[in-house]
Amino acid sequence: MNKLKSSQKDKVRQFMIFTQSSEKTAVSCLSQNDWKLDVATDNFFQNPELYIRESVKGSLDRKKLEQLYNRYKDPQDENKIGIDGIQQFCDDLALDPASISVLIIAWKFRAATQCEFSKQEFMDGMTELGCDSIEKLKAQIPKMEQELKEPGRFKDFYQFTFNFAKNPGQKGLDLEMAIAYWNLVLNGRFKFLDLWNKFLLEHHKRSIPKDTWNLLLDFSTMIADDMSNYDEEGAWPVLIDDFVEFARPQIAGTKSTTV
């Protein structure tokens, strides 16, 4: 780091804080991305395995990882971890299976469906994270949570959640399941989340299509406190149009009572 300019050193420090990565990884990633901090950070979160030093994977004990998998594998099907194994996995991590941390791990494992991991998902996911023990995985969780502060990575996580949560073979996501996952992933991110849930339970009562799920994130990031910037002529799903129509009088009523 001594050979770097002061501006580059600042970027290395910022990169390390934001990504929770090592100095070597920071220098490697920034130098490959013309020292553009935003580009380097974005690329790191999209493909961390390209930048994290091979020593992380080199120090991985494959036998130890295999033994860890065997602790959780389904007794009836050795190629997957079933619901009991997932519960044990969460207990070992001291995590609630319904917590966002477990969902983030599933995202990093690229899990296809909830309540199970295939052997490949578990082994590849742990290898990519450089983990061969529960202790190492625990230490990675704050870094994964930090990763979601980058909007592009959160969007990827959010869109993953739809496919993960729905029943295989179904196009839409059951309403109750959609609301449960929205409460998990959009809590603190969508100012109208409670009102949205109320609207769905009172007026929709049907499954949620993928495009509505995906576009709700865009809606949540752009909508003003009074919804005055909503464009009815925009390419929004009908459900979001109907929600705005439902919500505006309630928002106006709330404001008038607080004045």
Curated annotation (Swiss-Prot):
Subcellular location: Nucleus; Cytoplasm
Post-translational modifications: Mono- and poly-ubiquitinated by ARIH2 and ARIH1. Monoubiquitination by ARIH2 is mediated by an interaction between autoubiquitinated ARIH2 and the UBA-like domain. The monoubiquitinated form preferentially interacts with non-neddylated cullins and modulates cullin RING ligase (CRL) complex composition and activity.
Residues modified to N-acetylmethionine: M1
Domain DCUN1: 60-248
Ranges of residues in domain UBA-like: 8-45
Cited Pfam families: Cullin_binding (PF03556), UBA_4 (PF14555)
Site for Essential for interaction with UBE2M, residues: C115
Molecular function GO labels: cullin family protein binding; ubiquitin conjugating enzyme binding; ubiquitin-like protein binding
Keyword annotations from UniProtKB, A to Z: Acetylation, Cytoplasm, Nucleus, Proto-oncogene, Ubl conjugation, Ubl conjugation pathway
GO biological process: positive regulation of protein neddylation; protein neddylation; regulation of protein neddylation; regulation of protein ubiquitination
Result of changing M16A: Loss of ubiquitin binding
Tissues and organs where the protein is expressed, per its UniProt entry: Expressed in pancreas, kidney, placenta, brain and heart. Weakly or not expressed in liver, skeletal muscle and lung. Strongly overexpressed in thyroid tumors, bronchioloalveolar carcinomas, and malignant tissues of squamous cell carcinoma of the oral tongue. Not overexpressed in aggressive adrenocortical carcinomas.
Domain of life: Eukaryota
Effect of D211A: Loss of interaction with CUL1, CUL2, CUL3, CULA4, CULA5 CAND1 and RBX1. Does not affect both nucleus and cytoplasm localization. Reduces cullin neddylation. Loss of interaction with CUL1, CUL2, CUL3, CULA4 and CULA4
Transmembrane stretches, start-end: none
GO CC annotation terms, alphabetical: cytoplasm; cytosol; nucleoplasm; nucleus; ubiquitin ligase complex
Gene3D superfamilies, alphabetized: Cullin, PONY binding domain, DNA helicase RuvA subunit, C-terminal domain, EF-hand
Entry domain remark: The DCUN1 domain, also known as PONY domain, mediates the interaction with different cullins. The DCUN1 domain mediates the interaction with the N-terminally acetylated NEDD8-conjugating E2s enzyme leading to the NEDD8 transfer from N-terminally acetylated NEDD8-conjugating E2s enzyme to different cullin C-terminal domain-RBX complexes; the neddylation efficiency correlates with the DCUN1D1-cullin and DCUN1D1-E2 interaction affinities. The UBA-like domain mediates interaction with autoubiquitylated ARIH2 leading to ubiquitin ligation to DCUN1D1.
UniProt subunit comment: Part of an E3 complex for neddylation composed of cullins, RBX1, UBE2M and CAND1. Interacts (via the DCUN1 domain) with the unneddylated cullins: interacts with CUL1, CUL2, CUL3, CUL4A, CUL4B and CUL5; these interactions promote the cullin neddylation and the identity of the cullin dictates the affinity of the interaction. Binds neddylated CUL1. Interacts (via the C-terminus 50 AA) directly with RBX1. Interacts (via DCUN1 domain) with the N-terminally acetylated form of UBE2M and UBE2F. Interacts preferentially with UBE2M-NEDD8 thioester (via N-terminus 1-26 AA) than with free UBE2M.
Function comment: Part of an E3 ubiquitin ligase complex for neddylation. Promotes neddylation of cullin components of E3 cullin-RING ubiquitin ligase complexes. Acts by binding to cullin-RBX1 complexes in the cytoplasm and promoting their nuclear translocation, enhancing recruitment of E2-NEDD8 (UBE2M-NEDD8) thioester to the complex, and optimizing the orientation of proteins in the complex to allow efficient transfer of NEDD8 from the E2 to the cullin substrates. Involved in the release of inhibitory effets of CAND1 on cullin-RING ligase E3 complex assembly and activity.
Listed name of the protein: DCN1-like protein 1
Organism name: Homo sapiens (Human)
